[in-house]
Amino acid sequence: MPRTRTPLAAIVLAAGKGTRMKSNKAKVLHEVAGRPLAYYPVKRAVELGASPVVVVVGHQAEAVEAALSAALPEAPLRFAVQEQQLGTAHAVLAAKRALRGYRGPVLILSGDTPLLRAETLEAVVSARRRARAAVSLATMTLEAPRGYGRVVRDARGRPARIVEEKDATDAERAVREVNAGLYCVDAELLWKKLAKVGTANAQREFYLTDLVPMAAQAGGVAGVEVPAEEASGVNDRIELARANRVMVGRLAEAFMRAGVTIEDPARFDCDEGVEIGADAVIEPNVRLRGRTRVGARTRVGVGAVITDGVLADGVTVNPYTVISEAKVAEGAILGPFSRLRPGADIGPEAHVGNFVEVKKSRLGKGAKANHLAYLGDAEIGAGANIGAGTITCNYDGERKNPTRIGDGAFIGSDSILVAPIEIGAGAYVAAGSTLTDPVPAGALALGRARQVTKEGWVAQRQAEKQMKGTATGPAPARKGRPAARRAS
C-alpha cells in the first residue's frame, strides 16, 4: 500500500444527512461490505499515511463519531462539527481548528466515496507536488453527468473552474468531465482562500469548488482523471447496492488470487475484515460477516451464514448452517441446518448435525450431536454421543444452569437433562429419560415410566364397545313430543 513520504493531513466530509437515502440514519452510516460508508475514505487516507485525519460531522454527529472510532480504533482521528450544513467550503472550514498549527498539504475527500483506492489518493497528492501547483483535483468522465459539477479548462487544458450544474450554461452542461470531489491543497493557502468564498450561486451555499479559480491564479491547478467507478459518490439505495457489489467483488478477487476457491463470485457476500485461508472452498450464497476467520482447506456450504465465527483448518460446514460468535476446531463437521450461537466451542473432529442448536457450550474432541438436539450451557466430553432429540434444560426461569457430560458418555435419544446436572464419563442414559440427578461414571440411568403391555387389549375393547351398542338400543322419545319418524 503506498504511503506518502511527506507530511499529509486529511479532511473527510461526513456531515450531510443524505435525503435521497430516505432514511432516519445518516448517509455515511449506511454500510458497504459491513462497514459505514465513511470508514473507507478514512481508512484509505490512513493507509496513505495521513495524520491527522479530521472527520467533519454534522447530522447525527455522535453516532458517526462513535461508529468510526470503533471501526478504526488505532487511526489518528480528530472530529470537527459543522453545526449548520452551509456548503462544502463551510464544512472544510469547520476542520480548521482541528488542524491548528499544521503546515503542509491537506487531502480533502468526501465521506460517501467508499470505492476510492489509496493509489488514487496518492496520484492526486503527487500530481500537485510534481506540477508544483497550488491545488490538485480529481476529475472523472461520465456518460450521464447529471448532478455533478462540470470541469471547465483553460486554453492550455488546465482546470480553470468548476461550475455546479444549477449554475451551468447549456454549453457547460454538455461537458462530460466532472468534479470527483477529491482535492489536495496546501493548508496555509486553503484557509486563506476559503475566507474569500461567498454564496453567489443558485444554492446560496459556500462551495469548495470556488477554491479552483482562486488557485488557478495563485499557482495553477493540476487535474488528475480517476476511474468513475472509484470516485462516484453514494447518494441513494441503488448506488449503495452497486457500491456494495463492487466492494464485495474486489474482496472476492483478492481471496481468489490468494488461493481461495469461490465457486460463484457473483453469489458471494462478505464483509471487509473477513479472513479466508488458502485452499478453502466457498460455495454459492454464503455470507461471511464481521471478523469471521475461515481456515485453510475448510469448505463452507451453500447458504451458510457466519458472523464473527472462527473456523480452524479443514472444517466442513454443510449447507444452511448459521454460526454466530463461535469457534470450530480442526476437522469438525457442521450441519446441514445446524446453528452455533455465541459461546459455542466445537472441538476437533466433533460433529454437530442437522437441526442441532449449540449455545455457550463446548464439545470435546470427536463428540457427536448428529441431529435434533439443543445443547445450552453444557460441557460435553471427548467422544460423547448425544442422541436425537436430547435437550439440556438449562434455564429455570431465573438463571442459566450448567450440564456436564463426561468423556465417552452415551445419551440416548429423546433424553431431557434438567440442569444443573452431571453425567459421568462412560455413563449411559437410556432413551426417553428425564434426569434431574447426577449419573456416576460408568452407570446406566433410566428416568422414564416402566412399560406396561396388555396383550389382546384392542380386541377386548372392541368387543366391549359392541356389547354396549347392542344393549343401549334407540333412545326413548321425550314426554310431550312425538317420536321422530324414520325415513321411508
From Swiss-Prot:
Pathway: Nucleotide-sugar biosynthesis; UDP-N-acetyl-alpha-D-glucosamine biosynthesis; N-acetyl-alpha-D-glucosamine 1-phosphate from alpha-D-glucosamine 6-phosphate (route II): step 2/2; Nucleotide-sugar biosynthesis; UDP-N-acetyl-alpha-D-glucosamine biosynthesis; UDP-N-acetyl-alpha-D-glucosamine from N-acetyl-alpha-D-glucosamine 1-phosphate: step 1/1; Bacterial outer membrane biogenesis; LPS lipid A biosynthesis. InterPro entries: Bifunctional_GlmU, GlmU-like, GlmU_C_LbH, Hexapep, Hexapep_transf_CS, MobA-like_NTP_Trfase, Nucleotide-diphossugar_trans, Trimer_LpxA-like_sf. Binds 1 Mg(2+) ion per subunit. It comes from the Bacteria. Its cofactor is Mg(2+). GO terms for molecular function: glucosamine-1-phosphate N-acetyltransferase activity; magnesium ion binding; UDP-N-acetylglucosamine diphosphorylase activity. It catalyses: alpha-D-glucosamine 1-phosphate + acetyl-CoA = N-acetyl-alpha-D-glucosamine 1-phosphate + CoA + H(+); N-acetyl-alpha-D-glucosamine 1-phosphate + UTP + H(+) = UDP-N-acetyl-alpha-D-glucosamine + diphosphate. The keyword Nucleotidyltransferase applies. UDP-N-acetyl-alpha-D-glucosamine binds at residues 13-16, 27, 82, 87-88, 110-112, 149, 164, 179, 235, 341, 359, 374, 385. Acetyl-CoA binds at residues 388, 394-395, 413, 431, 448. Residues 259-488 are annotated as: N-acetyltransferase. Residues 1-237 are annotated as: Pyrophosphorylase. Residues 238-258 are annotated as: Linker. Residues 459-488 are annotated as: Disordered. GO terms for cellular component: cytoplasm; membrane. It holds the Pfam family NTP_transf_3. Keywords: Acyltransferase, Cell shape, Cell wall biogenesis/degradation, Cytoplasm, Magnesium, Metal-binding, Multifunctional enzyme, Nucleotidyltransferase, Peptidoglycan synthesis, Repeat, Transferase. Transmembrane segments: none annotated. GO terms for biological process: cell morphogenesis; cell wall organization; lipid A biosynthetic process; peptidoglycan biosynthetic process; regulation of cell shape; UDP-N-acetylglucosamine biosynthetic process. The active site is at 371 (proton acceptor). Mg(2+) binds at residues 112, 235. In the N-terminal section; belongs to the N-acetylglucosamine-1-phosphate uridyltransferase family. Homotrimer. Catalyzes the last two sequential reactions in the de novo biosynthetic pathway for UDP-N-acetylglucosamine (UDP-GlcNAc). The C-terminal domain catalyzes the transfer of acetyl group from acetyl coenzyme A to glucosamine-1-phosphate (GlcN-1-P) to produce N-acetylglucosamine-1-phosphate (GlcNAc-1-P), which is converted into UDP-GlcNAc by the transfer of uridine 5-monophosphate (from uridine 5-triphosphate), a reaction catalyzed by the N-terminal domain. This is Bifunctional protein GlmU. It comes from Anaeromyxobacter dehalogenans (strain 2CP-C). The gene is glmU.
